[in-house]
């Protein structure tokens, strides 16, 4: 793979160069190029939908985690704004509004709120990833061509496979969750000071089955920043 013949320390070509010199190393690379070209002509490489599908058991586990995650919003928000014990929705909303109004003067309040959400949502992201990849795939490595591409270093990364088959996860801008507007909404389609994780940029959708317009907008925000 790329680690053996690519420009990495202790790979085949640098060692060959040290032993036999640059001229023979150039001939070796030319020989590899011709050999790989002829191989691709007779053994075409591609990937299809079958390479990204996950089993029914993995999908069931994923839905279970998603349902559990959707309910942690109130608890995370209450913890982030310092509410202890019992609370009602109106009290929580007033606390969140006060935190929002004071966040410009006291940024730590917003940071504490974001940290609380991330701490609760990261385990959910990890649970979904471990359920779907790689054991949850219908086609396993090395028969799975997408996994083969990533693991050999040809193209793509584990993040790409995660976003295709599992979820996109928490979207962040400069290390923070997407900001909310002066109205208290992160996007016009959400309620003011909505505590749902998805209102704060947590995307439990995946590219394989599609994502919602709001999730796509959050994803575009992070992509443009990058």
Model region roles, listed by residue range:
Residues 1-101, 111, 147-150, 154-226:
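Feature marking long nucleic-acid-engaging regions of large polymerase/nuclease enzymes
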Residues 100-145:
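Internal maturation/activation junctions in enzymes
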